[in-house]
Amino acid sequence: MQAIISTAPGQAALVHDRPLPTIRDGYLLVKTKAVALNPTDWKHIEVTQKPGILFGCDYAGIVEQVGPGVQSGFQPGDRVAGFVHGGNSKEPQDGAFAEYIVAKADLQIHIPEHMSFEEAATLGVGITAVGQGLYQTLSLPFPSPSSIHEDGAEKPANPATQPILIYGASTASGVLGIQFAKLSGFAPLAVCSPDHFDLAERLGAVAVFDYADGEDAVEEIQDYVRGMGQPLLKAWDTISIPSSARFCGDALSSGNGPQYASLLSMTCPRPDVTSTTTMAYTVFGEDWGMGTAHFPASGVDAELGRRWWALVQQLLNEGRIQTHRIIAGEGGLDGVLGGLQQLRDSQVRGGKLVFRV
């Protein structure tokens, strides 16, 4: 089968003779229909040393076979999507960029009827990042039926409720983060480019701020928070670079234990702010590797992942979560490596690059 794998240190190529993966306990064998690209994909290629490791994390497809021990109600023929662990040196056959893949059942969803393969393929990494960042780390309450009216219409965000800062609000993770924070009863304050203000507001941000305004934007956030009458104690940074960490730290209110959560290893420079970095791959509950580094399994994170994806299934079925804007790539798996170069060169903005397989 076709697959994008490591061929030498820091290099990857599309091959045409990759064997089908072996299905493991708790896993599904899936025929891939679409894949979406993330920065973590090209970063894994850069650090991978061994040949034969499959890349890619986001996909959608059709179940071909259900492995032993699967208790999640999947059957052959089901349309599914979710999160797989591409670039994993401990399990080289895990990954998304192939015609057939294996996917841990606990971290997958049945694709709702109203959703296309391409839309569903955008979810995996972002959904997992939201679960770990907003809920496991920043301790937002899980969305519940109380966040909607009896007639099914969403309640508007209450301007008097507790604010949360989402930096990088137009990224795939940020777009989802706005929506989930709103469903959890928080008031999302979105930081992004002005080109994406309308998107952030449409998804539920109560206010939007231009990251390029720096200190002026920080002052605007502080003024807005004072008007709300609630301190800003939680910030989620989907960009996770020194300037974004500093921005978040400057914007957070003083006292009462302010928290900063990031997707990459980054620390808020303010000493009174608790900084936490999440690594999405811990939700698999298995030992894993990235390049030459190795990481232990986390049973706690695996249980969070299982519970979180079950809730996400319900919210998607109810149509309460919108996917990110799709940027259609060309060439199927043949086009993926070029797409990853586009990501690396910061040529993809305000949407998710998706390839039909």
UniProtKB/Swiss-Prot annotation:
Molecular functions per Gene Ontology: nucleotide binding; oxidoreductase activity, acting on NAD(P)H
The protein's annotated pathway: Antifungal biosynthesis
- Write out the similarity annotation: Belongs to the zinc-containing alcohol dehydrogenase family.
The answer, when asked if Transcription regulation is one of the entry's keywords, is: no
Keyword Repressor: yes or no?
A: no
Which keywords label this protein?
Answer: NADP, Nucleotide-binding, Oxidoreductase
| EC number(s) on file | 1.-.-.-
Q: What is this protein called?
A: Trans-enoyl reductase resD
Pfam families in alphabetical order: ADH_N
Q: Could you say which residues bind NADP(+) here?
A: Y211
Q: Which EC class, in a word? A: oxidoreductase
Functionally, this protein is described as follows: Trans-enoyl reductase; part of the gene cluster that mediates the biosynthesis of the tetrahydropyranyl antifungal agent restricticin that acts as an inhibitor of CYP51 and blocks the ergosterol biosynthesis. The highly reducing polyketide synthase resH, the short chain dehydrogenase resG, the cyclase resF, the FAD-dependent monooxygenase resA and the enoylreductase resD are required to generate the first stable intermediate desmethylrestrictinol.
Matching entries from PANTHER family are given as:
HYPOTHETICAL OXIDOREDUCTASE (EUROFUNG), ZINC-TYPE ALCOHOL DEHYDROGENASE-LIKE PROTEIN C2E1P3.01
